[in-house]
Regions:
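Short acidic-aromatic low-complexity motifs
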Residues: 4, 25-26, 45-46
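Short, surface-exposed ligand-recognition loops at beta-strand->loop->(often short) alpha-helix junctions
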Residues: 22-35
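Short, well-ordered beta-strand segments in beta-rich or mixed alpha/beta enzyme
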Residues: 15-22, 51-81
Length: 109
């Protein structure tokens, strides 16, 4: 993933997606590598992608992905690509589950 700075716009626009993944320490590194690869090779090149950050807790049992998109439709279109369908199937084998939740920025402080 690129090292560009993730910024929350002062005027709430677009779509924020926060996805949490639950895994074991045994699969944490492989999961993070699969997510990094998905962002580097596919997601960052999709229409409407603004930026993202991956976070792992110190127990290596949870990953949180924060991503920003121009619109909800752009995010959904990325999920429907054959490449992401295949990658998400693989990612699901590395974790107990994952849950993307879509948010709109309500306030920036």
């Amino acid at each position: 993933m690129s090292q560009k700075s993730l910024q929350i716009p002062a005027v709430p626009t677009g779509q924020t997606v926060i996805t949490t993944f639950e895994m074991t320490p045994a699969t944490a590194t492989e999961l993070m590598e699969a997510l990094q690869s998905a962002f580097d090779e596919v997601i960052r090149h999709q229409v409407g992608f603004i930026g993202a950050a991956l976070h792992m807790n110190d127990a290596m049992t949870r990953v949180c992905n924060y991503s920003q998109w121009r619109s909800r439709d752009d995010y959904k279109a990325m999920l429907r690509t054959p490449e992401m369908i295949a990658r998400n199937r693989h990612i699901l084998t590395l974790c107990k589950g994952f849950e993307p939740v879509m948010y709109e920025v309500a306030r920036v402080v």
